[in-house]
A protein has these predicted regions:
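Non-catalytic substrate/cofactor recognition surfaces at enzyme active-site rims
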Residues: 1-284
């Protein structure tokens, strides 16, 4: 998030994953039952203050129902869009030639409709099977929690002791000061829940962090099965999950309080999931 047309912008900090993965389920009499998709893009936002929104995920679900089913279908069709590995990918063009202003809900509809229409266009190529092997695995791995040192705790207390209207060196200093003190109360390690599901030659993995796209692409590249995609913020929300290289760059996703676990966490999680997928590959 460098801001629009920031003159200090050098290059993107990481890769993107433009692929939309999906699982389509229908009955033996060809009636659509459900479709679960996965896309690596941060939520879009753009709603009035005080409004709670399902964002493009919800709009995608509605659009898929419009495209695939009769509104009176019973039971009703279920469309689902899941959040892919998009902890470091958002929808903002930071170098636009012309800045466009969107109306409330407008941009999320653009994203959702383009995604839904792209999936719909590929449905004719889907090969359905009456039977596929199913398998699942769950595990928890310990991850060390990053803790503030005494100097940082003293800084946080000093910041929070100031009046709310005191001049700030950084607009978010009170926010991060509070996060620092909160993290000091965390246990020394957490149990990180990880899941992997096999559906035929497809696998789905689940991670309880805002996962960087680099990690999602690594899992896709290393998977022992034909296709794999990852759902982030699944079974928990433990903050951002930068890679070692991103920690070295020092973006805000690596700051203490935004990131809460050890530097090697992303790599430990990826390695564990690949081991789980290897076992699922052998399952019949």
């Amino acid at each position: 998030n460098p801001g629009v047309n920031n003159p200090n912008l050098l290059k993107p900090a990481g890769p993107v994953d433009p692929e939309i993965s999906f699982i389509s389920v229908k009955s033996l009499d060809d009636k659509p039952i459900a479709l679960l998709a996965n896309y690596s893009l941060h939520y879009v936002g753009g709603v009035p203050a005080g409004v709670i929104s399902a964002d493009y995920f919800g709009v995608f679900a509605e659009r898929m129902a419009e495209l695939l089913s009769d509104r009176w279908q019973d039971p009703p069709f279920v469309g689902i869009m899941t959040n892919g590995t998009s902890g470091d990918v958002n929808n903002i063009n930071v170098q636009p030639k012309e800045i466009k202003r969107y109306k409330p809900f407008e941009k999320m509809k653009i994203v959702a409709f383009e995604a839904a229409d792209a999936v719909f266009a590929q449905l004719s190529n889907v090969k359905y099977a009456e039977w596929v092997p199913l398998a699942a695995e769950y595990t928890e791995i310990p991850l060390a929690v990053r803790k503030p040192n005494e100097e940082l705790i003293a800084w946080a207390n000093e910041i929070l002791a100031k009046p709310m209207d005191a001049p700030k060196k950084h607009s978010l200093e009170r926010h991060y000061a509070q996060r620092t003190l909160d993290l000091a109360k965390w246990p020394d390690q957490i149990a990180c829940p990880l899941q992997a599901f096999r559906i035929g030659d497809l696998c789905v993995t689940a991670i309880p962090f805002e996962v960087f796209t680099e990690t999602g692409l690594e899992i896709k590249d290393r998977t022992p099965l034909a296709k794999t995609f990852t759902i982030e913020l699944a079974n928990g929300s433990f903050g951002y999950l930068p890679t070692r290289s991103q920690h070295a760059l020092g973006g805000y996703e690596t700051w203490l309080g935004t990131n809460r676990v050890e530097v090697d966490a992303a790599h430990k999680i990826a390695d564990t999931l690949i081991e789980m997928l290897e076992r699922l590959k052998k399952a019949n």
